[in-house]
Amino acid sequence: MNLEDLKKRQEKIRNFSIIAHIDHGKSTLADRILEKTETVSSREMQAQLLDSMDLERERGITIKLNAIELNYTAKDGETYIFHLIDTPGHVDFTYEVSRSLAACEGAILVVDAAQGIEAQTLANVYLALDNDLEILPIINKIDLPAADPERVRQEIEDVIGLDASEAVPTSAKAGIGIEEILEQIVEKVPAPTGDVEAPLQALIFDSVYDPYRGVILQVRIVNGVVKPGDTIQMMSNGKTFDVTEVGIFTPKAIGRDYLATGDVGYIAASIKTVADTRVGDTVTLAENPASEPLAGYKQMNPMVFAGIYPIDSNKYNDLREALEKLQLNDASLQFEPETSQALGFGFRCGFLGLLHMDVIQERIEREFNIDLIMTAPSVVYHVNMTDGEMIDVANPSEFPDPTKIATIEEPYVKAQIMVPQEYVGAVMELAQRKRGDFVTMDYIDDNRVNVIYQIPLAEIVFDFFDKLKSSTRGYASFDYEISEYRSSKLVKMDILLNGDKVDALSFIVHKEFAYERGKIIVDKLKKIIPRQQFEVPIQAAIGQKIVARSDIKALRKNVLAKCYGGDVSRKRKLLEKQKAGKKRMKAIGSVEVPQEAFLSVLSMDEDDKK
């Protein structure tokens, strides 16, 4: 491996990712590129090849990023080395997108020829521009009956401000236009800058746990060279490890003699503990370390918190291990142990959003075989106390005594909703019902409107996305970012069963909606909790004040069945005896609460009032 060869090779490297809104054909395009460059034989080819998680295939979304090396012989006769880094399109996985873009020089922007630009397309384009990437717009699905490539070309220029005159019309499904895209990558995406002779600097953009080889780092080499036998050092904590193997993905892992500047591949170095490596950290060589780390990623703060508890309490330690392994390549997942009187031992977890929460729950249940109970999600509130102190509260059961609270502030998001004109009314009505404040509205073209609202995050984590989809027949697209904290009239609502508070059912609610939400919940719980041998009152309370109540009637055995005719006082005596027995039972009996009860707090819905 002489330096000249390495420098020549570096000029032939092109690192790029594909960015798109959900369902605009990103994974299909990646499949076609793999086929065209003959990276994957037709025998191994399957739809959504890079979406290796079952969950990704079933939901038709990309959750984790994937990096792959391809060789392409261009029209100029030269062979180029492409690194394709696949990215998720959903708003909850923006962090994954920003990580993969940091490892690239170019991005292919896929826009659906029928649907045009959507909210998340915009969000991801801005991320790409922040990373100074060369953006190549392409217009996909031109074989659809509703396709209108010219309108979309105009939209790309007007809304994003990119020159779309050379945007390639493609159909990833039919394989049209793939070669033009590959040629554009060669011409327009710059080769990686970086110095082979400089000390090693490699950016960790993902990591996976292998039970035999420990933690395997996925890296982009920015400067220098790394090979088996080297001793690497993590720049964040100074820990050192001996490299056992380096290589690339095609999608299968293939060992190599070295990784040099511009390469995207993996390093295995028998790293045993998950905590020693952090995504966004810089790897360097121990004997000739780089003077400073690369600019990593901005740390993502979780927005939504929920309790996760194993249904079988013996699996508490398994759950901890599962969370640690998921955290390894999902740096945005945070968790800490917590206990609940109702649910026992579990963890309080922080997520980027509801889809993220959903995906983590499903991955734990599938990959680690642990059945879970999740509590209702909540957000982080700033609570200003009367003594001048400010505390952050993410768990409703930790809310301080209301008499000591001066004000409560909640997070608001700037929600950008793109929607066809005929649904604007429905969107505005929904946003207002969710305590949203109108900001602005502009027309993208004759038919589509971009509406911006400020909405409390707590309203969005409930069911905003589902409601938005159903009120616009699925045509709306939605993206949000945290904008500010605002003071709100919020109260903590407790649910009492049989006079006892159930901590896992507590939630924070706006004072205005407290009564109706309390009523909805007690009525729902009444339907869900099975009848007991004794009467069970369900109450919703704010502080000491009960705002709603519903009773589950007791199951009664007919004690009069064998008392034919006879004196009324005899019947009364039997009934009194039954009553006394029930009373005794109530004092010692506890109420079984099924899992649906916790979820019912989640799916509280205005429709339930009807």
UniProtKB/Swiss-Prot annotation:
It comes from the Bacteria. GO terms for biological process: positive regulation of translation. GO terms for molecular function: GTP binding; GTPase activity; ribosome binding; translation elongation factor activity. Pfam families: EFG_C (PF00679), EFG_III (PF14492), GTP_EFTU (PF00009), GTP_EFTU_D2 (PF03144), LepA_C (PF06421). Keywords: Cell membrane, GTP-binding, Hydrolase, Membrane, Nucleotide-binding, Protein biosynthesis. GTP binds at D23, H24, G25, K26, S27, T28, N140, K141, I142, D143. It is found in: Cell membrane. Residues 11-193 form the tr-type G domain. Its main location: membrane. PROSITE patterns: G_TR_1, G_TR_2. Gene3D superfamilies: 3.30.70.240, Elongation factor 4, C-terminal domain (3.30.70.2570), Elongation Factor G (Translational Gtpase), domain 3 (3.30.70.870), P-loop containing nucleotide triphosphate hydrolases (3.40.50.300), Translation factors (2.40.30.10). It catalyses: GTP + H2O = GDP + phosphate + H(+). GO terms for cellular component: plasma membrane. Its EC number is 3.6.5.n1. It is a peripheral membrane protein. InterPro entries: EF-4, EFG_II, EFG_III/V, EFG_V-like, EFTu-like_2, G_TR_CS, LepA_C_sf, LepA_CTD. Belongs to the TRAFAC class translation factor GTPase superfamily. Classic translation factor GTPase family. LepA subfamily. Required for accurate and efficient protein synthesis under certain stress conditions. May act as a fidelity factor of the translation reaction, by catalyzing a one-codon backward translocation of tRNAs on improperly translocated ribosomes. Back-translocation proceeds from a post-translocation (POST) complex to a pre-translocation (PRE) complex, thus giving elongation factor G a second chance to translocate the tRNAs correctly. Binds to ribosomes in a GTP-dependent manner. This is Elongation factor 4. It comes from Streptococcus suis (strain 05ZYH33). The lineage of its organism: Bacteria, Bacillati, Bacillota, Bacilli, Lactobacillales.
